Amino acid sequence: MTNPIKELKNIFIQIGRMFRVKKNEVIPSLSALAVYIILNALIIMRYYDSFSKVHVAFWKNFIKKFSVSGFDPITYVVLSTWGPKYDIHRHPLLAFFVYPLYLLNTALMDLTGLNLVQFIIALILLFLMFYSFIFMMRICRDIIGLRNTDAALLSGFLFSCAYIMLTFIVPDHFAPSMFMLLMALYVCGVKIRDKKRLNGWQAVLMFIFTAGTTLSNGAKIVIDALFVEGKRFFRPKYLIFAIAIPCAGMWYLSDAEYRYYRLPVEQQRRADVKKASEREWAKNHAAFMDTTTIMDSAEAEKAFKVWDNKRILAKYRKDQKLPWNAHKGKPLVKKGMLQYTDMTTPRWQSLVDNVFGETIQLHQDYLLGDTLRDRPVFVSYRNVVNYIVEAAIVLLFLFGIWCGRKSRFLWMAHLGFGIDFTVHVILGFGLNEVYI
């Protein structure tokens, strides 16, 4: 019978070894870190005067003023006044993961009279970036088999891509997601290389933190477990305790969290909107009846109804011209999760200008613009050189897949990529918002 204390000690030892920086990783990782320290400093300087204030409406202050390519500053809000303010069904545990940081920020606000949320987030982002870079290097070197110099160069290339750089300087959920996915790929890649098993507790732990941050990423942990375990994955014990129970538990928790925290707020908001609409109707009705020259009350009511319908239609048309409506594609259906799909935004142009364009090379026009504010969905490069560079990168990407077509690790990674491609490109979730 195994000693649970000894087993727990071994777990912490394994985790500690994974985060130990090796000699040949020091110079590349610190060089990358230096660049990202400068980038984070620029973000802090840009918003410090507004975001360091304590006695303000945090949501309005952060959401209205922060604008970097559409990324959301919700984490700034949560660390300033805690609550499950993320989309709960997409990020079920993220608010709880950052709760200790909220306590830290609250204590610092009491001590200094300043909101130091930017500095706290910057330190976390730099930690995530540093180890994401290291895990990427290790994947290239220890699993793919490249030399250390080549691994450092490829990692440097990845972390020089436009939206990777933005990911690690903005207070969104993408940085922790990327960190955990790279760590999972590294851990599972080593298991495949050494022909070792992915223990149930390892799969569960990775699933909780990955799916808890972004629910859809939990599917990638299931895929990783399948590739590592092979036929053993389908053993009833593994399926039940390492896969089924964590998946069901995560969904139950997200649903319970939604019903407890978000549903009452949404119901109250709908009630407030309804009351406001009724007040507006009563005000308009009274004003119309006081000023109309129609003496017959029934005819006056008909005339008011016609006038009110025109007012509602004009308001609807005006709302449809706003960026968040004008740039939205038509969904597959208008209810449930499928209401977030997009069947009309052009796929080819999305791939050229956004998926393999803006994410790698920022466009000169509408630089760091937001499609929900002031940026068109599609922006073209001024110079043909940008398209040549993009085409070269895509061709190298496809050539790399061909060269690694016999690699189990490659197909494990690309099946996860396939999930993202299906969700975002084929179904169109967030297709009109480049950063997603």
Regions found by a protein language model. Give the residues of each.
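Transmembrane signal-anchor helices characteristic of membrane glycosylation enzymes that use polyprenol
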Residues: R17-F71, T75-W82, A244-Y260
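Lumenal/periplasmic acceptor-binding loop at the mouth of the active site in multi-pass
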Residues: P73-F119, A298-G404, F409-F417
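Membrane-interface alpha helices of multi-pass inner-membrane proteins
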Residues: L198-N217, I221-E229, A242-A248
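Short acidic/glycine- and proline-prone juxtamembrane loop motifs at membrane-interface regions
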Residues: I169-A175
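Membrane-interfacial entry segments at the cytosolic side of transmembrane helices
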Residues: N24, G230-A244
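Transmembrane-helix signature of polytopic, membrane-embedded enzymes
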Residues: M136-S160, L410-L415
